[in-house]
Regions:
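Ala/Thr-enriched low-complexity intrinsically disordered regions
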Residues: 10-12
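Vicinal oxygen chelate
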Residues: 16-23, 46-99, 103-137, 148-158
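Conserved beta-strand-loop-alpha-helix junction that forms the acyl-donor binding cleft
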Residues: 29-31, 128
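Conserved active-site tyrosine of GNAT-family acetyltransferases
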Residues: 35-40, 109, 141
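Short glycine-/small-residue motifs
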Residues: 143-146
Length: 158
């Protein structure tokens, strides 16, 4: 799969990889217009089908669907888990990018004035699984993580 980041604001078309099956993830949002702007404009994700209650997005070749729904308990009472000295929001979802793609995304998000839960940084430096990571919330409280591995071959390494 390849990703070309538009900088700073044009949409990108990401094609699913033939070697990895696209996943489908549906998440609740209590403010559909704000979430639509966030995923469409901030990330430049291509919009697919939609209705008055939901919107499909091409999330790096995967299908992300935002569904309008009242706030959920997980959005009202976020949990965290300590990882590498940071309180990681749980639950969260995201994508593993290439290093340069991650750097471009971090720059894009900063240019939009994004408030990070965990600022972009390098985790597990000098260890197996060294990775760049950042965490943020969408306007409805859903936590996202974007990461890139120094060595992609260590994605599942112990």
């Amino acid at each position: 799969m390849f990703v070309r980041w538009p900088y700073p604001s044009t949409a990108t078309r990401i094609e699913p990889s033939m070697s990895l099956s696209p996943f489908h993830l549906a998440i609740p949002v209590h403010d559909l217009p704000a979430a639509r702007r966030f995923y469409g404009e901030t990330f430049g994700l291509e919009e697919g089908r939609s209705s008055a209650q939901w919107v499909d997005f091409n999330f790096y070749g995967h299908q992300l669907v935002i569904h309008e729904h009242p706030k959920t308990a997980s959005q009202e009472h976020a949990s965290t888990n300590p990882v590498d000295g940071h309180d990681v929001p749980v639950p969260h979802f995201g994508i593993v990018l290439g290093w340069e793609q991650w750097e471009a995304l971090a720059g894009r998000l900063r240019s939009f004035g994004t408030q990070f839960v965990i600022e972009p940084y390098i985790r597990f430096q000098g260890q197996v699984g060294e990775q760049a990571t950042m965490f943020l919330l969408d306007p409805c409280g859903n936590a996202l993580e974007f990461k890139a591995f120094k060595d992609m071959g260590q994605l599942f390494a112990k």
